[in-house]
């Protein structure tokens, strides 16, 4: 497990405005909890605590949305 920005397809973070949205998203993916980190290095994005290793996370590089 690790603490990290949970990622969508193409290395994109989940944008957020509310902690509750991120907490729900993170816990549904097996994390202990989550919150919305405002003004972080990837903008306003969901950060998960104790996220399982099989769940994608944001890695170095750009978001490659099609």
UniProtKB/Swiss-Prot annotation:
GO terms for cellular component: extracellular region. One of its GO terms (molecular function) is toxin activity. Pfam families: Toxin_3 (PF00537). Residues 2-64 form the LCN-type CS-alpha/beta domain. Disulfide bonds join 12-63, 16-36, 22-46, 26-48. It comes from the Eukaryota. Keywords: Disulfide bond, Ion channel impairing toxin, Neurotoxin, Secreted, Toxin, Voltage-gated sodium channel impairing toxin. GO terms for biological process: defense response. The keyword Secreted applies. Expressed by the venom gland. Has the structural arrangement of an alpha-helix connected to antiparallel beta-sheets by disulfide bonds (CS-alpha/beta). Belongs to the long (4 C-C) scorpion toxin superfamily. Sodium channel inhibitor family. Alpha subfamily. Alpha toxins bind voltage-independently at site-3 of sodium channels (Nav) and inhibit the inactivation of the activated channels, thereby blocking neuronal transmission. This is Toxin Boma6a. It comes from Buthus occitanus mardochei (Moroccan scorpion). The lineage of its organism: Eukaryota, Metazoa, Ecdysozoa, Arthropoda, Chelicerata.
């Amino acid at each position: 497990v690790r603490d990290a920005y949970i990622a969508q397809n193409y290395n994109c973070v989940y944008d957020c405005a509310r902690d509750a949205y991120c907490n729900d998203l993170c816990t549904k993916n097996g994390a202990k909890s989550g919150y919305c980190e405002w003004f972080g290095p990837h903008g306003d994005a969901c950060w998960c605590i104790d996220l399982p290793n099989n769940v994608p996370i944001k890695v170095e590089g750009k978001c490659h949305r099609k």
